[in-house]
Each structure stands twice: as structure tokens, then as C-alpha cells.
A protein has these predicted regions:
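N-terminal secretory signal peptides that target proteins for export/translocation
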Residues: 1-12
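Generic early N-terminus positional signal peaking at residue ~5-7
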Residues: 6, 17, 35-36
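Short N-terminal leader segment in a subset of presequences, especially plant chloroplast
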Residues: 10, 20, 24, 40-43
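Short, threonine-centered small-residue motifs that mark membrane-proximal processing/anchoring sites
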Residues: 16-17, 21-32, 146-157
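Short, surface-exposed loop and linker segments with low hydrophobicity and enrichment for Pro/Ser/Thr
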Residues: 25-33, 54-62, 90-105
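N-terminal segment immediately downstream of the Sec signal-peptide cleavage site
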Residues: 31-69, 74, 153-155
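Compositionally biased regions
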Residues: 6-8, 21, 106
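Acidic, low-complexity intrinsically disordered segments
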Residues: 76-155
Length: 157
């Protein structure tokens, strides 16, 4: 009786494996990869981020991960949406990006750097001139800057 029961287990395992593999390929991707960069007076940053695969009603994608560097310093983390980078209290990020200009929202996205500093690029429509600005914060040294930058982000095909 044992050999007979054991032989039924192999086809069942194969069937489960086939169903599992089919399910993996049946679902669409849950993330998009982007390449981004910005440059301005005293700053150059670039890298990649991942977003959810579908935009919201305004065409913005939620940024879920980030990597790269700013002025040669490694990015170590993405600032959670709804929170402010240290040194920029009262200005929470929303972590959104889109394919059309302006690509960033008023709140932008934020990230931490390996040297203990932070950055928050955002679209400042109320600034003169309107455009993308990158707030930089160095909390230990109580320094900040906010240069106008040229920002680009594209979805990796």
C-alpha cells in the first residue's frame, strides 16, 4: 500500500508546481524602475527608484524604493510619505513622481545620505522662478540650502 500512496504524491506535487509557476507569470509586475537625476548650483544627484506600477488619478506614481548618490555620497534610505526630512519640519514629502512636467509635486520625495544629511527635491510653483528645487539639510551643522535644479526621471523600458 505504501508504494501506491507514494506514487500519487509525485503527480500532485508536479501539478502544484505547475499551478504555482503559472500564477507567477499570470500577474502583472507590481513595480516600475525609473532612472532619475538632478543638477543645480552645488548639487548633482542621480540614481534609480522603484514605484508602484499604476499611477493615481493625477498621473503620479508612488515611489517605494530609492538608490543612488548625491555629490558622491550614497543614498541610504527613502523618507516615508507623510513625514519631513530632518531639518525641514513642517514640509512632509509625498513620494510621488510622474512622466509629465512637472514631474514632482509640491511635496516631492526625500532621502537620507550616508554622511547624515538629507535631501528633498520638490516642485515649487510658488517660487520665482517656478521649478524644481532641492532642499538640502545638514542637521548636525545646522546648514540648509535650496537651489533650483533641473530634474528628470524616466521609466526604464
Amino acid at each position: 500500500m505504501c508504494p501506491r500512496n507514494g506514487s500519487r504524491g509525485i503527480p500532485l506535487k508536479r501539478a502544484l508546481l505547475i499551478v504555482s509557476l503559472a500564477a507567477l507569470f499570470a500577474f502583472p509586475a507590481e513595480a516600475l524602475e525609473w532612472r532619475w537625476s538632478y543638477q543645480g548650483e552645488g548639487v548633482a544627484a542621480s540614481g534609480a527608484f522603484t514605484t508602484k506600477d499604476a499611477p493615481n488619478a493625477d498621473g503620479f506614481y508612488d515611489i517605494t524604493g530609492i538608490k543612488g548618490e548625491m555629490n558622491g555620497v550614497a543614498i541610504t534610505g527613502l523618507q516615508p510619505a507623510g513625514t519631513s526630512i530632518p531639518g525641514n519640519d513642517g514640509y512632509p514629502v509625498d513620494g510621488l513622481v510622474r512622466t509629465v512636467v512637472p514631474q514632482l509635486s509640491l511635496h516631492g520625495f526625500g532621502y537620507s545620505l550616508a554622511d547624515g544629511t538629507y535631501a528633498n527635491p520638490f516642485y515649487g510653483d510658488h517660487f520665482v522662478p517656478p521649478g524644481v528645487y532641492a532642499f538640502f539639510s545638514d542637521p548636525p551643522n545646522r546648514k540648509t540650502s535650496e537651489p533650483l535644479v533641473k530634474f528628470t526621471a524616466t521609466i526604464v523600458p
